[in-house]
Amino acid sequence: MKQKVVSIGDINVANDLPFVLFGGMNVLESRDLAMRICEHYVTVTQKLGIPYVFKASFDKANRSSIHSYRGPGLEEGMKIFQELKQTFGVKIITDVHEPSQAQPVADVVDVIQLPAFLARQTDLVEAMAKTGAVINVKKPQFVSPGQMGNIVDKFKEGGNDKVILCDRGANFGYDNLVVDMLGFSVMKKVSGNSPVIFDVTHALQCRDPFGAASGGRRAQVTELARAGMAVGLAGLFIEAHPDPEHAKCDGPSALPLAKLEPFLKQMKAIDELVKGFEELDTSK
């Protein structure tokens, strides 16, 4: 079955092409740390021959606690992104939270991301669509895979069909997430075979029901990522940190930066194996 290709500059993203890595840090903690993390990702992905897009947030507007670190903000964040692009020649993805942010952010980065908690906000979707940028839609934890087609339709009605879908798990009772491996193919089907990627980092979240910050299951990142890659996906979304225990956001789910290369070697091997198989139709 023909898969839709979404192009991010010279990077082609599709479910039957070699996977694209969307990775970096959760939030911009500082200019120097962003440079360090981006350089490491670029070095490793170039060595392994993996197409790469750097990810970081300039504002974490959905933190649980009013006291949690949010990021440097729009103006300073865009300055850091511009320096990263000039220094490393890297593509960049970041999220927007308000309609007014869509165009200023799209003027700087290559992919704008619709956060899971905001994925049904029509005004935000319309503003993002109007930019003409490539869009990454995070599937809300409370939305079924089949409902993602409605969000894609909103973007198409807004004149933008350059949409990538991203799963980051589904609510499993209170304060826990699970990943439905059958949901990936449903998301492909309802979106006209748009590229589907897997955010393994945020799928590992598991919070203390009375705490102010998300916990995580970093020790299980490799096994969950292996399972997702075995489905046959367009890309993998993963955040890393040189010192996860002291990261300012989602450290418990972050891959230790030093483990990035061996981790990606495994992901690439699985991706190549699975996409080398003949497509088998078992529906009849």
Curated annotation (Swiss-Prot):
If you read the UniProt record, what top EC class would you report for this enzyme, in one word?
Answer: transferase
Q: Which gene encodes it?
A: kdsA
What species does this protein belong to? Escherichia fergusonii (strain ATCC 35469 / DSM 13698 / CCUG 18766 / IAM 14443 / JCM 21226 / LMG 7866 / NBRC 102419 / NCTC 12128 / CDC 0568-73)
Mind listing the GO biological process terms from this record? keto-3-deoxy-D-manno-octulosonic acid biosynthetic process
Please report the name of this protein according to its UniProt entry. 2-dehydro-3-deoxyphosphooctonate aldolase
Q: What is its main location?
A: cytoplasm
Q: Which UniProt keywords apply?
A: Cytoplasm, Lipopolysaccharide biosynthesis, Transferase
Protein family (similarity comment): Belongs to the KdsA family.
Question: Pfam families from the xrefs?
Answer: DAHP_synth_1 (PF00793)
